[in-house]
Structures are given as structure tokens and as C-alpha cells.
Amino acid sequence: MIIKPRVRGFICVTTHPAGCAASVREQIAYVARRGPIERGPKKVLVIGASTGYGLAARIAAAFGVGAATLGVFFERAPADAKPGTAGWYNSAAFHDEAAARGLQATSVNGDAFSDEIKHKTIDAIRRDLGQVDLVVYSVAAPRRAHPKTGVTHQSTLKPIGHAVRLRGIDTDNEAIKETLLQPATPDEIADTVAVMGGEDWRMWIDALDAAGVLADGAKTTAFTYLGEQVTHDIYWNGSIGEAKKDLDRTVLALRDKLAARGGDARVSVLKAVVTQASSAIPMMPLYLSLLFKVMKARGTHEGCIEQVDGLLRDSLYGAQPHVDAEGRLRADRLELDPAVQARVLELWDQVTDDNLYTLTDFAGYKAEFLRLFGFGIDGVDYDAPVEPNVRIPNLIE
């Protein structure tokens, strides 16, 4: 079938298998060009492994180090004439490329928050890997069914204590708009922490440790975004910020647990990129469009694979890791360059409907958004029929 992009709001409801595969190959090629990652991990578990930063981590570990990988994700398979999700096709392509290079790859498809998927993952580690020496936690989800209480928690994107008015882009109409966000209630804050805080990461590490599948010296990291002044009302001072502070508290206990066996636990702070999650946040399309404009002009623009490849080389397995005062690994240094942030702030209130395409890189933002779903990738013939029914070999469900 011939598949074209169909966008509704912040979701593209179609995906292109060949485009997703080409995107995965591009990321592999980037890692290969940079050469081997020295002293890297050998057996890696990535929780949230099918898109964005999690996929990039799996690619960097496999093709930069030669690591065996186990990826956990929650994706929809293709059915009849309906394509699967982008993460499904990304993972299928990863398996194909890993097999071609003789790399061990296992995947588990299901709800990472559930005890069932944790148990299935542990069984797969025992069978295929024995133990893992790196656990990457890269889960982005709007809700979580708590495995112990059965309560479903819904995350909320709201400020705390007062309403906040945010500038942004109505991406459907390509117009500047303002959104008034009302303050979160205490229950909404608690629910957001339950979904996006550190509890599930801790549950994963506790389960892996109790099962004996964490190697001596194992490391774990959870990916997060903090941002700067422009985004702080939402990302640090809002309901999501409380979840991020919970992540910072959680990592201290995990660090103590792993340090007893020569290991380590860190929160890794990554730069703002286009993801399905970020595109749904009212201010982020405008912020990203301005950030792309400024960083591309300076030659410092990076995407997921550049960020995570650098994180592994420079910080997780580098001799001189970039660590902030709170002990987080920082890969977002170029975004937070004072000159970059000053220029973004300077342009923030100047953007109008008329100059949207000149003051910002909204065109680049839109292109990156479509790439998430396999569209706009160089070398792919989007007028040619493509087979949507792609399988993932040896998938555990």
C-alpha cells in the first residue's frame, strides 16, 4: 500500500515502515562514523526502547559498543491494512540491523509499569543475557496503572500555585496562540508524580536486583529534561517539575544500592527535541522552533542520537563525566549556553503569524515531527507501495 502522512493535532495517524527503517539506519550510521565507544556496556536493558531517546540509547549501545540489548516497549503491531506504530517499525528495523551484524537483540512488548512485564523481562534476561550491566529508563507515558494498588494515575501538565499564560504555536493553523493553564490541584500533582516520578524506575531496579540479574558494577540512568527560564514554569515549577524532583530523590537511594556492588545510578539531563510527548505541550513547538533556529545558526544543533551517543562516550563511560551540583549527568550544555538562551528569549515575544517562518525554524520543527513517523527521510520513495505487515522476530508479549 502507498502510505502518506495524515496529521491530527500533535499526532500523525499514519506511519511509514520503510521510512522508520531508514531513520534507524541513519542513526546507526552516525554512531558508526564516531567509532567504537570505549569501556562501554556489554549487556543492556532499555526500558522504553522504541522511539526517541530510548531507541537512540539502544542503537548507541548495540552499534557503538557491540552490546547485546533487551528492549522493552509498548507498541501496536500492524493489522490487516492498518500500519503499526512508528515504534513497532523502528524496533523491527533495529532487530534486522542487529541480526545482520551478529548482535544479540531481544524485545518485550507490553506495559512497562506492570509486574507482568517486569517478570517477563527478567526471565528473558536470564535466558538470553544472564545479567545486564546497564539499565536505561526512558519511559514517557500519560498514565500509569499502579501494579500494587490497581489505581490508574493520569499525569497533568499544569503550573503550581498560580495560573500561567503560555505563548505557543497552533500547529494545525500555523498561528501563534496563547494558552492559559490553571494551577494543578494536590491530587493532580500526586498523580503526575505517580506517573512520571521515580517510583517505577526504583521498582525495576529493585526487581532486577532481587532476581540476581544485575551484574556487579551495573549502572542505571533515567532520562529527563529540565530546560531553562523559558520553560521553567512548566518543566521545573509545575506538576511535571514535582515528578522530576521525585526522580532526583529516587536516584540517591538507587545510587547507594548499586554503589555497594561497584555500580552507579544517575539522572541524565538531555536537550529539548521533537517527540510525540513534547509536541503536545503548548509552548514546546514554539520553543523548539526558536531553539532549532538559534542552534543551527551556531552549528550546535543535535537530535536524539547525537545526544545519547555523546552521553555514553563522554559521561556514562567517559573519563571526565559532565556532572552538575546535584549529581546529574548533563548532555544539555549546548542548549543551556547563555548566548543561546538569551537569543531565544529575545525572539520569544517577537514571533507573529507573519514572521513565524523567518524568525523561527518552524519548517525544521515540522520536518522533525514527520520524521518521528517515518516521513521525510532521504532516499525513501513515498510514492511506491510498501508492505505494512512487518514482524519483530522472537518478540515476547
Curated annotation (Swiss-Prot):
UniProt pathway: Lipid metabolism; fatty acid biosynthesis
Residues noted as binding substrate in the record, renumbered to the chain: 225
Tell me which residues this entry annotates as catalytic.
Answer: 235
**InterPro entries named among the record's database cross-references:** Eno_Rdtase_FAD-bd_dom, Enoyl-CoA_Rdtase_cat_dom, FabV-like_NADH_b, Trans-2-enoyl-CoA_reductase
Alphabetically ordered keywords of this record? Fatty acid biosynthesis, Fatty acid metabolism, Lipid biosynthesis, Lipid metabolism, NAD, Oxidoreductase
Reactions listed under catalytic activity? a 2,3-saturated acyl-[ACP] + NAD(+) = a (2E)-enoyl-[ACP] + NADH + H(+)
- Asked if NAD is a keyword of the record, the answer is yes
If you read the UniProt record, what top EC class would you report for this enzyme, in one word?
Answer: oxidoreductase
Q: What is its EC number?
A: 1.3.1.9
Q: Which residues bind NAD(+)?
A: 48-53, 74-75, 111-112, 139-140, 244, 273-275
* Keyword NAD attached: yes
GO: which molecular function terms? enoyl-[acyl-carrier-protein] reductase (NADH) activity; NAD binding; trans-2-enoyl-CoA reductase (NADH) activity
Q: Where is this site: Plays an important role in discriminating NADH against NADPH?
A: 75
Gene Ontology terms: biological process: fatty acid biosynthetic process
Q: Which protein family is named in the record?
A: Belongs to the TER reductase family.
According to its UniProt entry, the function of this protein is described as: Involved in the final reduction of the elongation cycle of fatty acid synthesis (FAS II). Catalyzes the reduction of a carbon-carbon double bond in an enoyl moiety that is covalently linked to an acyl carrier protein (ACP).
User: How the protein assembles, per its UniProt entry?
Assistant: Monomer.
Query: NCBIfam families, per this entry?
Result: EnoyACPredFabV (NF043048), PRK13656.1 (NF010177)
Protein's name in the database:
Enoyl-[acyl-carrier-protein] reductase [NADH]
Provenance organism = Burkholderia pseudomallei (strain K96243)
Where is the organism placed in the taxonomic lineage, from the top?
Bacteria, Pseudomonadati, Pseudomonadota, Betaproteobacteria, Burkholderiales
Gene encoding this polypeptide?
A: fabV
